[in-house]
Amino acid sequence: FDEHFVGQMIYDYTSGYPFLVSRICQIMDEGGLTWDREGVLAAVNHLLKEHNTLFDDMEKKVSQFPSLAETLKAIIFGGKRVSFNYYDRDLNIAIMFNFVKEYQGATLIYCRIFETWLYNLFISNAKDTSIYQQGEYDKPRFVHRLAT
């Protein structure tokens, strides 16, 4: 297999977040998945659907800090450019929990997996609202669809 390609693809989805990298590799190894594009996508899909302590903790933090949730929603759903500023209370919390990172002065969701997971969380919490219908319409523009 092309270990550089697979490693880069895993990095593209995880931004090197240690638990995510390890878990994807574990899913691929224990699940007998191929070490190629399809195997990585299958492992990422599996990871996004599973119950784990990382996602439990993320959900708790989003619930505990409603203004943080609103900031994350603005970035994910609206594509809002938020300046990276440690003194912004919500961003400071998001930085502390590794929800976001800085890139060229802007705030980005830390990695594709977090972006997709948060998107799914917010959509599931709002499925009976107009934001749900708009999010489903806009999803292809903002969230990378994974092959199933």
Where does each model-flagged region fall?
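Minor-groove-contacting beta-hairpin "wing" of winged helix-turn-helix DNA-binding domains
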Residues: 106-111
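Short, amphipathic alpha-helical interaction segments positioned at domain boundaries
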Residues: 114-144
